[in-house]
Amino acid sequence: MADPRRARLTDDTEIAGARALIVEARFYDDIQDAMLEGARAELTAAGLTHDVITVPGALEIPAAIAIALDAAEAHGKPYDAVIALGCVVRGDTIHFEIVSMESSRALMDLAVSRKIPLGNGIITVNTDEQAWARAKATELDKGGDAARAALAMLRIKRRLAKG
């Protein structure tokens, strides 16, 4: 079976020195530690600096991103890319569907309206075992995957801006 992870692109000259924002939901600390490690490794390898903001849950991620983008712009230090990290585990109520769908929709709305490269690393799973398989950098590395997606979109944005 093919490796499901996005490949790391090696030519990072056009994005080196860019600034990224990671917003993580700390609902499951151990899982978030693993996802954050994967995302940070990808950003560092690509030559980006980054800030991390922590929020209580996945639904708070889009609002925190919007607030941070506005503040960074106001201070003359805009972010070039954003990575959202979180974990939503299915329970016995429809809360899972609401959190999963609304956080994803809000992130897509932000990416499109703000024209910001955004990697969605909010994993949605049925079990803790599935969460761990997706969080660990040695397995599916969804934190790293979200960072690679944001980096790929940043490359596209910069190439198209050049004309």
Curated annotation (Swiss-Prot):
Stored InterPro entries: LS (IPR034964), LS/RS (IPR002180), LS/RS_sf (IPR036467)
Catalytic center residues: H95 (proton donor)
The residues listed in the UniProt record as binding (2S)-2-hydroxy-3-oxobutyl phosphate, with positions renumbered to this chain, are: D92, T93, R134
Family matches, as Pfam families: DMRL_synthase
Q: Drop me one GO molecular function for this one.
A: 6,7-dimethyl-8-ribityllumazine synthase activity
Query: Which pathway does the database say it acts in?
Result: Cofactor biosynthesis; riboflavin biosynthesis; riboflavin from 2-hydroxy-3-oxobutyl phosphate and 5-amino-6-(D-ribitylamino)uracil: step 1/2
One GO cellular component term? cytosol
Catalytically driven reaction(s): (2S)-2-hydroxy-3-oxobutyl phosphate + 5-amino-6-(D-ribitylamino)uracil = 6,7-dimethyl-8-(1-D-ribityl)lumazine + phosphate + 2 H2O + H(+)
**What does the UniProt keyword field contain?**
Riboflavin biosynthesis, Transferase
Q: Which GO terms describe its biological process?
A: riboflavin biosynthetic process
Q: Which CDD domains match?
A: Lumazine_synthase-I
* Entry EC number(s): 2.5.1.78
What are the binding positions for 5-amino-6-(D-ribitylamino)uracil in this chain? F27, A58, L59, E60, C87, V88, V89, N120
Name the SUPFAM superfamilies on file: Lumazine synthase
* HAMAP family per UniProt: Lumazine_synth
Q: Main role?
A: Catalyzes the formation of 6,7-dimethyl-8-ribityllumazine by condensation of 5-amino-6-(D-ribitylamino)uracil with 3,4-dihydroxy-2-butanone 4-phosphate. This is the penultimate step in the biosynthesis of riboflavin.
Question: Into which family does the record put it?
Answer: Belongs to the DMRL synthase family.
**Which named protein is this?**
6,7-dimethyl-8-ribityllumazine synthase
Whose protein is this, by species? Rhodopseudomonas palustris (strain BisA53)
